[in-house]
Design a protein with these regions (language model features):
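The feature captures the beta-strand-to-loop junction immediately N-terminal to the Walker
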Residues: 6-8
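A short, proline-enriched helix->beta-strand linker immediately N-terminal to the Walker B motif
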Residues: 121-125
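H-loop/switch region of ABC-family ATPase nucleotide-binding domains
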Residues: 162-164
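Hydrophobic anchor residue at the start of the ABC signature
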Residues: 116
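Catalytic Walker B motif of ABC-type/P-loop ATPase nucleotide-binding domains
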Residues: 127-131
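Conserved ABC transporter NBD signature motif
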Residues: 29-44, 186
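Helix-to-loop junction immediately C-terminal to a conserved catalytic motif
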Residues: 21
């Protein structure tokens, strides 16, 4: 399933993702992944890929070192790593690998790409991305949208993305969750982009 999280600033989209990743603790209740509470077991980390923001990167590493680090953590051999990275060559546009630059020295857009690739190369069963279209040029936005769809369809990955870009979310999501002030106010099926009219109406009313 490919789930889109939408809502105005402060609606709770990023907070929800951080709760799922056990980066913050809930005041009440708990989060389960595959039947296990994320704050009591770390097994969910083995099959979960995520990129929330630049703090997930290790700024003093080169891209090669960063991807090697991820591969070591997830026990991915070098041959497999190189095969998976090759799938992203077009997305990187020869601007990332082989540059001998540290992550801190890349543009926001290329840092975004590195973080997203790092989340995807583990072939996760669950993938969480916060504002994946931020900082990217239009062609890269289209590419990442197709990549997200592909990993969901071909690998059976459950994907949750948050975004202010309603059109992209409506284009690729099978289900859209609308949050408002920390609460779920709509759970919209989105076959063939059916939810976009209701979303446009909601946000149009909010803007008046």
């Amino acid at each position: 399933e490919l789930i889109g999280l939408v809502g105005n600033n402060g609606a709770g989209k990023t907070t929800l993702l951080r709760l799922i990743l056990d980066l913050i603790q809930a005041d009440d209740g708990f989060v389960e992944s595959n039947g296990q509470k994320v704050n009591e077991s770390g097994t969910w980390k083995e099959y979960t890929g995520s990129y929330i923001d630049g703090r997930f990167l290790i700024d003093f590493l080169t891209p090669e070192e960063y991807f090697d680090f991820i591969a070591d953590v997830y026990h991915i051999d070098d041959e497999t790593l190189q095969e998976r990275l090759a799938q992203f060559e077009g997305f990187m546009h020869d601007e990332i690998m082989g540059t001998k630059k540290y992550l801190r020295d890349f543009s926001q857009g290329n840092r975004q790409k590195i973080g997203i690739i790092g989340a995807m190369i583990i072939n996760p069963k669950v993938l969480l991305l916060d504002e994946p279209f931020n900082y990217l040029d239009p062609s890269s936005q289209m590419t990442i949208a197709h990549m997200i769809q592909r990993i969901c369809k071909e690998q059976g990955t459950t994907v949750i993305i948050s975004s202010h870009n309603l059109n992209f979310v409506a284009d690729i999501s099978s289900r859209i969750l609308l949050l408002e002030k920390g609460k779920l106010v709509k759970d919209l099926p989105n076959a063939d982009g059916a939810a976009i009219a209701e979303l446009n109406e909601y946000f149009g009313i909010q803007a008046e």
